[in-house]
Regions:
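Short, low-complexity N-terminal tether/leader segments at secretion or assembly junctions of large
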Residues: 1-17, 369
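GGW-centered surface loops in extracellular recognition modules
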Residues: 10-82
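Short aromatic-cysteine micro-motif
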Residues: 65-66, 92, 97-287, 392, ...
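Short, solvent-exposed loop/turn elements at domain surfaces
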Residues: 78-84, 139-144, 496
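Short solvent-exposed strand/turn elements
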Residues: 85-103, 358-374
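C-terminal, surface-exposed recognition/capping segments
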Residues: 196-199, 227-250, 255-258, 263-264, ...
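Short, conserved secondary-structure segments in the cores of folded domains
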Residues: 281-282, 320-323, 510
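Small/polar beta-strand repeat architecture
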Residues: 303-380
């Protein structure tokens, strides 16, 4: 084991010379998790092998309820740098990861072209890392716990409902927003995971796959780079679409698997490590498929207006009395009668009058004539402020701490401008990550573009209907939805669209779905 000399200031580790406290080197043993750099917070304890990079429990800790959580150390990333060792193969999508052993401060990292991942800012402070559930949550005597071979909780009464949780005095209901109090059943400082944290693990997984040269420290590695990503329960038969050798144990509901049960039954190639973000037993399981998971930190306030007319012209002009839209606004059209070619797409608009606007690049001359109605929806998107602590979010839509609604958004969030595919012919709602060799993630170290990468949102030119193998052909469902609640990862029947990057912007806080659950995280 490496030299473990440490210097503490009170309970805070201020100096160490042990590389195991860092994120590690992509493609090698132990990458993607690490050792907590200080005295463990109350309730946490080491497991057998926590300090040993060769152990299946490396970087894994147990909370007092029995939950197994992985420590994810702070890291910096660089996208598409010509100086990258991976640039020759991956070009604008080459990913480099560096820890605080390489750059002691964010300023030093930024100067070298590396960005601090947004997941490591919470409550107005940069964090040394975060604890993240190794497994999807299951019901552990009324507590949402991260346990191997549990029956994953869902937001619906028919399938291990979160409403059955009672721990820590919480009242939990079977809606997506119920995942916020569900996480609190483990303790007040826990939170339903954020999309920032999820995207950080997705980025680590992709970087690990790019750097790996064999399956030795990356069990899901594919030298052909076609299925070079974590495997998941996705083929609607308790197996992985990308590798049918990997099998999950049924939890008794449809084809949902028990938490962390990849490798069930044994056999050649059927190993748990193929289901983790780092391809090792110490990694986080089931980010690809099995259950969609609620991921906090982003929402939308949207309103719809009814179409009064649409022209067969180039460009197509829409009539809505007093529409209030401005040049460059992005809108979604659904349910138009007659001119159905407009439906289920996003558009950039140009204002032509108080009651009219055109759809940029849309020639509707050959479309069927508009007959009646249709909705145009415009939304304002928001992201958690750096000053906001994830544990502070509440589940309503009217209070100052609520994740949804104008009051909570004003207090807890900042404006965000997502990139959407609005080019005519490529502007459908169903998108996937990747578009030929185009850059998918922004490389900026600050600003709106940096936030998009922190959330794992693709560039407009970085998505397409077909996607790319580098990003697992993962699903990106672009949508404009009031009270948006993000869900990530996909479900047991989503096949290739499920994956570590998979994200849907379709869902709202009051949905209740048997294939949507949660896991927890905590900043300390």
């Amino acid at each position: 084991m490496a030299n473990t000399a440490k210097i503490y200031l009170g309970s805070v580790l201020v100096c160490n010379i042990n590389p195991q406290y860092e994120i590690g080197v992509a493609g090698t043993m132990g990458f993607g998790v690490g050792v907590y750099p200080g005295l463990l917070p109350p309730g946490f304890s080491e497991m057998d092998g926590t300090l040993n990079a060769a152990s299946p429990n490396f970087g894994n800790y147990q909370y007092s309820d029995g939950s197994v959580m992985a420590w994810i150390p702070r890291f910096y990333y660089r996208i598409g740098a010509a100086a990258s060792d991976r640039y020759a193969t991956y070009g604008a999508n080459a990913i480099d990861i560096a820890g605080v052993d390489t750059y002691a401060t964010t300023a030093l990292a930024n100067a070298a072209g590396f960005a601090l991942h947004r997941a490591f800012i919470d409550g107005g402070a940069e964090k040394a890392g975060f604890f993240f559930d190794k497994y999807e949550c299951s019901n552990n005597s009324g507590v949402a716990s991260s346990l191997k071979n549990g029956n994953p909780l869902s937001t619906a009464a028919a399938h291990n409902p979160i409403a059955s949780l009672t721990g820590n005095g919480q009242t939990v209901t079977n809606f997506y927003h119920g995942c916020i109090p569900a996480a609190k059943t483990r303790g007040n400082d826990f939170h339903c995971i954020s999309r920032f944290q999820w995207a950080a693990l997705a980025l680590l997984a992709t970087a690990h796959g790019q750097a790996a040269t064999s399956a030795t420290y990356c069990a899901w590695y594919d030298s052909g780079l076609t299925t070079n990503f974590p495997k998941g329960n996705t083929n609607n038969a308790l197996k992985s679409t990308g590798d049918t050798a990997v099998v999950w144990q049924s939890d008794g509901y449809s084809n949902c698997g028990k938490t962390g049960s990849a490798g069930y039954g044994g056999g050649a190639g059927n190993v748990f490590a193929k289901s983790t973000h780092n391809g090792q037993n110490c990694g986080v399981a089931d980010l690809n498929g099995n259950m969609w998971e609620v991921t906090l930190g982003m929402t939308c306030i949207a309103a719809s207006k009814t179409i009064a007319g649409a022209t067969q012209a180039n460009p197509c002009e829409i009539n809505i009395v007093g529409h209030g839209y401005a040049n460059g606004d992005v809108v979604m059209i659904t349910s138009a009668g007659g001119m159905t070619q407009l439906n289920d797409k996003l558009y950039t608009v140009t204002k032509t009058g108080d009651d009219t606007f055109t759809l940029d690049g849309v020639d509707s001359s050959a479309f069927t004539a508009w007959t009646t109605g249709g909705s145009v929806t415009k939304g304002a998107f928001y992201v958690a402020k750096e000053a906001t602590a994830m544990k502070a979010f509440t589940s309503g839509n009217s209070a100052a701490t609520d994740h949804w609604g104008a009051t909570g958004v004003a207090a807890m969030m900042d404006a965000l401008t997502p990139a959407f595919a609005t080019t005519s012919g490529a502007n459908g709602l169903d998108q996937r990550y990747g578009n030929s060799t185009n850059q998918v993630l922004e490389e900026e170290t600050s600003g709106n573009a940096w936030l998009l990468t922190g959330l794992g949102l693709p560039k407009a030119a970085g998505m397409s209907a077909g996607g790319s193998s580098l990003f697992g052909l993962d699903y990106y469902y672009q949508y404009v939805r009031n009270e948006l609640c993000l869900i990530s990862g996909g479900r047991w029947s989503n096949t290739s669209p499920a994956g570590v990057w998979s994200l849907s912007l379709y869902n709202i806080r009051t949905y209740s779905v048997a294939s949507v659950g949660l896991r927890c995280a905590i900043y300390v």
